[in-house]
Amino acid sequence: MGLELVNAGNNLPEEINVIIEIPKDSEPVKYEVDKASGAIFVDRILSTPMRYPCNYGYVPNTLCGDGDPVDVMVVLPLPLVPGSVVRCRPVGVLQMKDEAGNDEKLLAVPVSKIFSGYSHIEDINQVSAHWLERIGHFFEHYKDLEKGKWVEIDGWGNATTAKQILTNAVQRYKDTLP
């Protein structure tokens, strides 16, 4: 089965499917899934020697204002394999901008069936402040040594904001279909 057959989720916006591109604690390599072939390409080697603090991927069949699918950071104590699909619940959003414009990233936890350790987390205020600081620090600095690239963090939004971003991105994707 190709990744193009994976939908955004069966219970949107409460649950989403996230296709993992970059595992938690991986080396500073930015991978991206080619949406047409499903192959995992090396996008670039990050100049800043930092490891991803969480699993990182996207919600298929969504489209943000930057032309990409919705980015998602999946909080888990373990790394996931690139190309794997994990069902998650959005609990917040890192609101940020970079040299290309707005670049929000949803924060999500796996559904309880996959990992019950975060079943109590429903909103961003229930996520450890330490985790939020680590994630924010990574994204604020991971482009520091790349010429012409920058990031500005605008703070964290709650689950309601994350779900609205997701709902808008699903509709934007549907609007592009013939």
From Swiss-Prot:
Gene3D superfamilies: Inorganic pyrophosphatase
Matching CDD domains: pyrophosphatase
Obligatory cofactor(s): Mg(2+)
Keywords, sorted A to Z: Cytoplasm, Hydrolase, Magnesium, Metal-binding
Biological process per Gene Ontology, one example term: phosphate-containing compound metabolic process
Keyword Magnesium listed: yes
Subcellular location: Cytoplasm
Taxonomy, superkingdom: Bacteria
Binding-site list for Mg(2+) 2: 71
Function per UniProt: Catalyzes the hydrolysis of inorganic pyrophosphate (PPi) forming two phosphate ions.
Subunit structure: Homohexamer.
Protein's recorded name: Inorganic pyrophosphatase
